[in-house]
């Protein structure tokens, strides 16, 4: 081999050795998001929509160059809606996959399990859909943040709605049906608290506790009809809501009482699954609505989701979309995804302009509870064929201001975790 050629090969080899760390660093400049969403079963649509919307947000951000030189990478594992399995995956994400953020979760049981892992490993967990208030009050820890309304906010809005309705359409008695775990119990407890807080007179005539994903609600439906409440408050979500309403229709339940479902009842999944079967005049709400607010930003989000998936989004989609943008803003402020404590400070108080924000309002993360603060709209089912296959959507909106829906200080002092109480001093 000629001497000149051999020297060139040696020089090339040295260059490869010297530059390898830089190439590796460049390849490692990613913000890795490890998500856990259910992809099958009654909760499956929530997971499918969440993943699609998160991918939308990642693509939008990466198309603009990423954040501070970092590209976003999103991975998801089917949580199977099982807390124990989700904990195993989360630990694998952290130790093997080296994710920078934990993300997602639909079931509150899964969310409550994952927040323990987040705290143990000091890895930020962005909650995008599960709604139990416990994660932002009773069990709040430094590295947990939620970017969708929790049950306390929904029940505060619900209590205000019932207070207003009592003046024009008098009612006295309430019954409640919801799933027998934290999410279901939180709703009725927080509704009672807020009804009392706002001075509403009421009497509870029945509480009914089917298991999550129960196949048959007949016994509960007949008990409700026997107890004859003026208002039936429902705490189901997802496929459970659809199944309950379809099973209750032959009994004429919705003609005999007000059906009121202020947390998850207004999900587009219900509208698309029931069509003309869905009675008019049900009072529902959710964490995002495809037809409220009527802003350009909300229309764009809904249209972009439809272009990507061929269907309109359930409310879970916007929560996942918001979560990715919260991560991007935090990394942009800190400069990297590695300093968890700096990222916590960046997230506390963060303003997030989201598709669900009406004109003149911007969502923000409460620095005390790490809970996003948002307005909530409650509506009635009305005829509307703008979002097929649904033939019903919500209308006749009542909108409740964000700050009045948050837990008051005395509630936080009584129920808060040690971490939250330390912030209140």
PLM-predicted stretches and their roles:
Residues 1-11:
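Bacterial N-terminal signal peptides that target proteins for export
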Residues 99-207, 256-281:
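Extracytoplasmic ligand/sensor domains, especially the bilobed periplasmic-binding protein
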Residues 10-21:
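Bacterial N-terminal signal peptides
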Residues 31-55, 77-84, 106-107, 177-186, ...:
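Extracytoplasmic "Venus flytrap"
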Residues 248-321, 332-334, 338, 391-424:
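Extracellular/periplasmic periplasmic-binding protein-like sensory domains
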Residues 28-31, 51-74, 196-202:
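Signal peptide-proximal N-terminal region
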Residues 45-52, 64-138, 147, 209-218, ...:
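Beta-alpha junction/loop-to-helix N-cap segments that form part of ligand/metal-binding clefts
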């Amino acid at each position: 081999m000629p001497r000149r050629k051999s020297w060139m090969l040696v020089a090339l080899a040295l260059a490869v050795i010297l530059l390898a760390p830089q190439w590796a660093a460049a390849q490692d400049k990613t913000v890795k998001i490890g998500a856990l969403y259910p992809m099958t079963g009654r909760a499956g649509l929530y997971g499918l929509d969440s993943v699609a919307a998160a991918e939308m947000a990642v693509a939008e951000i990466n198309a603009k160059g990423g954040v501070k030189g970092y590209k976003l990478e999103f991975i998801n594992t089917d949580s199977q809606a099982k807390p124990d399995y989700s904990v195993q995956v989360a630990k694998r994400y952290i130790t093997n996959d080296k994710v920078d953020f934990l993300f997602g979760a639909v079931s509150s049981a899964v969310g409550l399990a994952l927040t323990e892992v987040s705290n143990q490993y000091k890895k930020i967990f962005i909650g995008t859909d599960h709604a139990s208030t416990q994660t932002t009050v009773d069990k709040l820890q430094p590295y947990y943040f939620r970017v969708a309304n929790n049950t306390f906010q929904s029940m505060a809005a619900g209590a205000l709605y019932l207070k207003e309705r009592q003046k024009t359409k008098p009612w006295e008695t309430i019954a409640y049906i919801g799933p027998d775990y934290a999410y279901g119990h939180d709703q009725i407890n927080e509704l009672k608290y807020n009804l009392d807080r706002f001075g509403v007179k009421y009497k509870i005539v029945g509480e009914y506790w089917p298991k999550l994903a129960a196949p048959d609600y007949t016994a509960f439906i007949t008990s409700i009809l026997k107890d004859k409440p003026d208002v039936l408050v429902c705490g189901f979500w997802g496929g459970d809501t659809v199944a309950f309403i379809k099973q209750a229709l032959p009994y004429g339940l919705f003609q005999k009482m007000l059906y009121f479902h202020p947390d998850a009842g207004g999900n587009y999944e219900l509208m698309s699954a029931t069509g003309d079967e869905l009675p008019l005049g049900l009072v529902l709400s959710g964490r995002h609505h495809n037809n409220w607010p009527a802003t350009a930003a909300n229309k764009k989000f809904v249209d972009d989701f439809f272009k990507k998936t061929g269907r309109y989004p359930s409310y879970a989609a916007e929560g996942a979309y918001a979560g990715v943008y919260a991560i991007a803003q935090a990394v942009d402020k800190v400069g990297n995804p590695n300093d968890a404590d700096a990222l916590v400070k960046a997230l506390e108080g963060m303003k997030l302009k989201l598709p669900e924000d009406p004109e003149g309002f911007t969502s923000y993360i409460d620095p005390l509870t790490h809970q996003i603060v948002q307005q909530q709209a409650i509506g009635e089912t009305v005829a509307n064929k703008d979002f097929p296959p649904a033939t019903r959507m919500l209308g006749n909106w009542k909108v409740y201001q964000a700050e009045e829906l948050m837990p008051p200080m005395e509630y936080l002092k009584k129920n808060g975790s040690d971490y939250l109480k330390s912030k209140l001093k």
